[in-house]
Amino acid sequence: CEYSSALISFNISPLTELYCIFVEFIQAIILKIYTYKIMNNVIVSPHYLSTSIGSKVFEMGGNAIDAAIATNLIQGIVAPETCGIGGDLFALIWIPGEKEPHYLDSAGFAGSGVNADDLKNFNTIPLNHPMSVTVPGAIAGWHELSQKFGKIDINDILNLGIELCHNGFEISEELHQSLTHHLDELSGQPSGYPFYRNDQALDVGYKIRRVQLGRTLELLANNGLMSFYSGEIGKAISESVDNVLTLNDLESFTSTWRKPLYSNIY
């Protein structure tokens, strides 16, 4: 969850990268909030690297939208227990001088391989089942926000994430706790391998590099954000969930601008 002067976005991943447990997501926000002010702009996020690296976007000539995308990107790298590129995105944007805010809905839908009869067999959302995965809307949301309101090239933002993935960062207390709590679910999954050693979560302060995620971001920088939903990445996503999400499901997804609900309370 990232806040800026112009954007609020929630990016929650049900399965891809790491599971986001909503209670822990809220706890992370309550426990630590990192604020950075540069000129007339303020960035607030749950992780100091998300805030500090996001602030660089202003120095690069970007606006609040660019900075919010960057903050969201970095948060998914350093705190995958809160969000990531496998999640969705909702944005509420108020442009100075305009009468009402813009609302972007970039939440993905269930795959065409899911039907109501199949879901009746579950009492709760099955976190370890492909049918719990919906089309990831976050990347499409970044694309739409950047195209409509962004000021700098999206690749300049992606490069900040690529650099961090390859240079590495230290495991935070919050990430360590989440990894420990979900050891049984995550340690045996490919996306979880880098975070564990000898069946134990990496210690606080351990420096980790997210090389595979960096390569994914490089593909997006080379081929465009929407290539996430097609080609090499799209096929890999579909295959990883046993084609419950088809390539057509991914390629047909688009973000939607909607009229926001509001009420006068004073």
Which ranges hold each PLM region?
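Noncatalytic scaffold domains of N-terminal-nucleophile
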Residues: 36-59, 64-230, 234-266
